[in-house]
């Protein structure tokens, strides 16, 4: 027997290419069962065998019970043999006791293995999805991925218990009960089961219906989860727009679609045992006509008839379960096909077999963009972008929203790859570098500070090795210490889902402290001070400028006051570099930068470049001091996928 630790499945060979949406091509039942057994169930072989033995014992007891009906009627109730009362009673008690113990044992074992398999399957699924490209998370919203991870994995892991129950308990029950029935009268048995062949065609039709409707029901459930995710995360926007009734109506429409799909699926599953009951009724009708006359004629005893009647009545119970498991398997098969489709996804961005050595010091980490082009869904974002961010200096990127600034960051870190051109760091193309080592070159601070539902300390450290002295230095540099000391538990205070227990400015400071602590040779700042007030911005800006010293730094800024001291400013417009130089040089030449600068500071007002007319979002939960609360594992999964998607959400900027 194996340990209780969920087993990680062996490496699989998925099909190349990333699909734009998760598709679920039909797989053969044998292939799916083989996959489930090979990667998960076989790790619990000892417990599976024990469960099979207990199920077989439980099933055999039904045959024993029906067999005891004959002496109970003939010897005790009809003949009145007092000496037979005790042993018949003891035998019946023994049968019920053994059946109860076997049932208890196999149910506990099946539940245990089911939970372990479900945990292992979900763990493997999450690990695999985190290896996929950003496009996968853009094309598949969190609600869909949560439904796959929780709903489909649970259905796939639990179906094994139903299948094994039929394979062991119900098959043994069926055989033992049929043996008793045949021993009483084989002709009665033939009459009782004569209608069984009539079930073949309708059951096949219903099985296909169940598989289709189960797939539709799961897809509808995924749409409901996605809608809920959008509603809860966009509650402030909905309230400010006054669209509560509209969003509630859209959610109700999705719910209606899901309910309709689930009703069709349940109706298909319920139809199989219903048909079996009708055929069973016809069989009993024939046996009563034929066997009843034999009892009247005295050729059969009441005990024989009751034993046969009990056996055949019990036979149809495992047969009904067989019908149910057929429907349950078709539903689970749809889930397994969807899971298999995700496992078949393969990242297009991978580490080369022989990665090049990395430039690990700041004086070698110059970054060169050479004729870089990129597009989203055939919509060009970058068009032949070429410039150099010199080693050890600060390069700022400015331009209207949609100019492609944030896309450059995504390409640098290989969250996506350019469709043309190349990016080099220290003269080495990023596509030839080890992915983990490449991303390890960067400290990143974006305008969307992504925090996890952990302590403040954990959100700053984020897996980095740091002693208390280094941690304190980072906290002081980002001015996190100022508010951390006021929290109930200091650095050990949970920040809430997505950092909802902190204000927007506080979340931004935590992200900056995280970057300070990482202490990497390349610093990427994507509107890093956008969430701060003027006083905090000045303090943090000074800390960032100090952090930038001696590093290759790239800064995306809307407020041009924050990049006046940059060594070089690259001006972008519609995916192209239209100008570059220092602040003074660009102002002297005129052009787009000078226009943006005058726009921001005309009449003493600050207007973000390209931000005029941008919709104003409502206050974040953290700004009001409200604490968001998760809801167990489902909330944790939702937060994880939300945070992963947040990494890619601004890529088109």
PLM regions: where:
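Membrane-integrated ABC transporters
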Residues: 1-62, 77-91, 106-110, 127, ...
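Juxtamembrane loop-to-helix connectors within ABC transporter transmembrane domains
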Residues: 40, 44, 106, 110-114, ...
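Loop segments that connect adjacent transmembrane helices in multi-pass transporters
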Residues: 123, 138-143, 216-264, 354
């Amino acid at each position: 027997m194996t340990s209780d630790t969920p087993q990680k499945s062996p490496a699989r060979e998925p099909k190349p290419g990333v699909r734009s949406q998760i598709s679920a091509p039909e797989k053969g039942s044998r292939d799916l069962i083989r996959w489930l057994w090979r990667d998960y169930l076989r790790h619990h072989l000892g417990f599976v065998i024990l469960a099979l033995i207990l199920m077989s014992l439980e099933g055999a007891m039904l045959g024993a019970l029906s067999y005891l009906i004959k002496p109970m009627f003939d010897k005790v109730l009809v003949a009145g043999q007092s000496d037979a009362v005790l042993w018949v009673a003891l035998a019946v008690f023994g049968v019920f006791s053994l059946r109860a113990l076997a049932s208890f044992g196999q149910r506990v074992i099946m539940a245990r293995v089911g939970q372990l398999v479900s945990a292992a399957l979900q763990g493997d699924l999450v690990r695999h999805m985190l290896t996929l490209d950003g496009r996968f998370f853009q094309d598949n919203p969190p609600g869909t991925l949560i439904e796959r991870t929780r709903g489909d994995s649970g259905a796939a892991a639990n179906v094994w218990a139903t299948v094994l129950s039929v394979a062991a308990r119900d098959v043994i029950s069926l055989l033992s009960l049929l043996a008793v029935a045949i021993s009483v009268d084989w002709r009665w048995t033939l009459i009782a089961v004569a209608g069984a062949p009539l079930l073949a065609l309708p059951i096949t039709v219903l099985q296909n219906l169940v598989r289709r409707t189960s797939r539709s029901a799961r897809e509808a459930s995924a749409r409901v989860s996605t809608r809920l995710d959008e509603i809860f995360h966009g509650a402030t926007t909905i309230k400010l727009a006054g669209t509560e009734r509209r969003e509630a109506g859209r959610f109700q429409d999705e719910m209606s679609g899901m309910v309709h799909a689930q009703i069709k699926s349940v109706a298909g599953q319920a139809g199989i045992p219903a048909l079996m009951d009708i055929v069973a009724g016809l069989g009993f009708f024939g046996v009563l006509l034929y066997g009843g006359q034999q009892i009247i004629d005295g050729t059969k005893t009441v005990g024989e008839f009751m034993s046969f009647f009990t056996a055949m009545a019990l036979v149809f119970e495992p047969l009904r379960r067989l019908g149910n498991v057929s429907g349950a398997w078709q539903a689970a098969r749809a889930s397994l096909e969807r899971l298999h489709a995700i496992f078949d996804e393969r990242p297009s961005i991978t580490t080369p077999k022989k990665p090049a050595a990395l430039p690990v010091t700041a004086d070698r980490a110059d970054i060169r963009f050479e004729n870089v082009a990129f597009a989203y869904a055939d919509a060009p974002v970058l068009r032949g972008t070429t410039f150099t961010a010199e080693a050890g200096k600060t390069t700022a990127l400015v331009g209207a929203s949609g100019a492609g600034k944030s896309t450059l960051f995504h390409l640098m870190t290989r969250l996506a790859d350019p469709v043309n051109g190349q990016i080099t760091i220290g003269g080495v193309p990023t596509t030839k570098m080890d992915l983990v080592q490449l991303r390890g070159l960067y400290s990143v601070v974006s305008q969307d500070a992504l925090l996890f539902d952990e302590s403040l300390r954990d959100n700053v450290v984020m897996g980095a090795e740091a002693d208390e002295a280094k941690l304190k230095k980072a906290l002081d540099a980002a001015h996190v210490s100022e508010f951390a000391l006021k929290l109930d538990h200091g650095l050990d205070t949970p920040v809430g889902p997505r950092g909802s227990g902190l204000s927007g400015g506080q979340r931004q400071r935590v992200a900056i402290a995280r970057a300070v602590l990482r202490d990497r040779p390349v610093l990427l700042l994507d509107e890093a001070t956008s969430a701060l007030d003027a006083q905090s911005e000045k303090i943090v800006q000074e800390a960032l400028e100090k952090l930038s010293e001696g590093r290759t730094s790239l800064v995306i800024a809307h407020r041009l006051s924050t990049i006046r001291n940059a060594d070089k400013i690259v001006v972008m417009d519609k995916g192209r570099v239209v100008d570059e130089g220092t602040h003074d040089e660009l102002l002297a030449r005129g052009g787009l930068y000078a226009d943006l600068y005058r726009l921001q500071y005309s009449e003493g007002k600050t207007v973000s470049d390209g931000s005029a007319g941008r919709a104003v979002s409502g206050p974040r939960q953290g700004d009001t001091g409200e604490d968001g609360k998760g809801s167990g594992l489902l909330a944790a999964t939702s937060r994880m996928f939300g945070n992963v998607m947040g990494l890619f959400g601004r890529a088109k900027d």
